[in-house]
Amino acid sequence: MTLSEIQRTLEKCETVPTRSLGQNFLHDQNLARWIVGCLQIQPGDHIIEIGPGLGALTEFLAPHDIRLTLIEKDGRLVRHLEEKFRSPTVEVLHLDALDYDLRQAWGKGPVKVVGNLPYYVSTPLIAKFTSALSPASRLVLTLQLELARRLNAEPRTKDYGAMTVCVNRRWEASFLRKLPASVFVPAPKVDSAVIALERRPADRVRPLDESLFDPLVRRGFSERRKQLRNLVPELKSRWADVAAALRVPETVRAEELSLAQWETLTDIARPSAAQSGQEMFDVVDECDRVLRAEPRDIVHVNNLLHRAVHMLLFNSRGDLLLQKRSIWKDRNPGRWDASAAGHLDSGENYPEAARRELREELGVEAPALERIGKLTPCEQTGWEFIEIFRGVHDGPFAPASLEVETVAFFNREHVKAWAAGSPQDFSPVFLLCQAFL
């Protein structure tokens, strides 16, 4: 939009930019076109635009063969957006982007996010749209220059901090360009920058207990001037060995550790788990009768018939709890699945395994579980007899970090429509379990 178009539109809407909403409207059309180009849009993408305002970016998004969701907090501008971009593939939501339900975005195509973020809420918005529940694969954001530099900072610099480390663990941050205040109206008091965040593929994310990683990093940066050993007292008695493993002096501070060193420190800080032997499964015949016990690897490599359980937990409103499998799983990594699932150990029965898996994967004691069905072995089940259990539980849950990316309750009808349109988002076994919803 040009300056004159912005002025006419504001007059038509009988409004003026509101400082409390962080409204600074982009008036450089070439720049708007360039920002949209940075999204690397593909046909069928679902683009979420945060704070479209008068539609400077939306004008260049709308012509694409995409689904478009516009999230606008200012009710004065919502009607303008609805009228200007009316289309079956465009949805305008009148709400704060912090209140947007990320679950709504699943099942609508590959998600990318764009927006000129209000500076006062940029950090929580980035945290939200880069969270484990977010379906986004790429974000192109206009931010305050200071924040953009923090996301792209290097160790041993003043901009490097907890946010740098935590975001860059799962996302590749790229500083695209600096924007002068003059390209906005009204001009903000600070310069801005455009950054891109690209989700890292699984082979570029080190397996790690992330329930320990984020708190450890934030604790380390909580007092930047302090030596790190004074902020992790649980490691202080063996700090000389820790520093040697990290290849740093014992006087190291948080800002001197790279992402890889923070990951190593997390592994060191993780309590040692009791060593267990090779998992043993019962091999069964076509009638599910136990023949013998074999190690897990032998069972899987040779496609021997064995046993497993899948649990479908519902909350008191009837919504279904789904888990997103860890990206490090050897089978169906990163896909959505039943609330909890797992193999039977040798000598274990189905109900015992169901209760154990709920404890291990979700950190809850089993509610009253009802057996609702059984799947027979086939390639899709991984040659498993699978008993399916149903239960009611409202949480809270404590997902096992190395096993589960996240969990969330979804409306059952949403899940059915999502699975029908995007079956690749789910494990093959869950698609079979749908018959029991």
PLM feature spans:
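An accessory alpha-helical subdomain
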Residues: 193, 197-199, 204-241, 249-260
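Helix-adjacent hinge/juxtasegments
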Residues: 330-364
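General small-molecule cofactor/ligand-binding pocket signal
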Residues: 91-93, 174, 370-372, 408-410
